[in-house]
Amino acid sequence: MTQKNGPLRVGIGGPVGSGKTTLTEKLCKAMRDKYSVAVITNDIYTQEDALILARRQALSEDRIIGVETGGCPHTAIREDASINLQAVVEMTRRFPDLDVVFIESGGDNLAATFSPDLADLTLYVISVCQGEEIPRKGGPGITRSDFLVINKSDLAPYVHVDLEVMEADAMRMRAKRPFGFTDLHRGKGVQEIIDFIVENGGLEPRSN
């Protein structure tokens, strides 16, 4: 079902190496049979993430647009999101029945946020490999994203991270905003994120 005001736009942010592209891939593969899905990726000088998603066959290539932001990638999702908004318009032109567009930011820091004009829902991805203290460092991505993804939970024993500490810190920093632990490589935790997107984005599976 196409949204009344256009497709649902889901922003996916997080530091380099946290698992943004893997999350985007898993979401596309899990949702593409029930919804009309597209992706817009952001890289500074290349379209590498778009190429990765195409190689992994997350979606057909015509459903993936790679945006080269140049300079600071934060600007393209926040202060001046016009290049991404244009990509959304182009994707909607290609697929008038589009239900959801995932907009993956370039690698960013804890201060990066999506403009509300660009994203209806925001997911922020961090990795346990960044350290146990990451949730309590705060920043808009940690405290204000609609759903915080704490990825690579399977590696916690190897990087000496206590997941219970991370959980307690995330609960304290985010108040009642949801978060979840994932092992995206194995697909663990993906369904919880999908359920969140469907419920909070008002998506309804298209009838066959």
Curated annotation (Swiss-Prot):
Its main location: cytoplasm. It is found in: Cytoplasm. Disulfide bonds: none annotated. Pfam families: cobW. Signal peptide: none annotated. Keywords: Chaperone, Cytoplasm, GTP-binding, Nickel insertion, Nucleotide-binding, Virulence. GO terms for molecular function: GTP binding; GTPase activity; nickel cation binding. Gene3D superfamilies: P-loop containing nucleotide triphosphate hydrolases. GO terms for cellular component: cytoplasm. GTP binds at residues 14-21. GO terms for biological process: urea catabolic process. Belongs to the SIMIBI class G3E GTPase family. UreG subfamily. PANTHER family: UREASE ACCESSORY PROTEIN G. NCBIfam families: ureG. Homodimer. UreD, UreF and UreG form a complex that acts as a GTP-hydrolysis-dependent molecular chaperone, activating the urease apoprotein by helping to assemble the nickel containing metallocenter of UreC. The UreE protein probably delivers the nickel. Facilitates the functional incorporation of the urease nickel metallocenter. This process requires GTP hydrolysis, probably effectuated by UreG. This is Urease accessory protein UreG 1. The gene is ureG1.
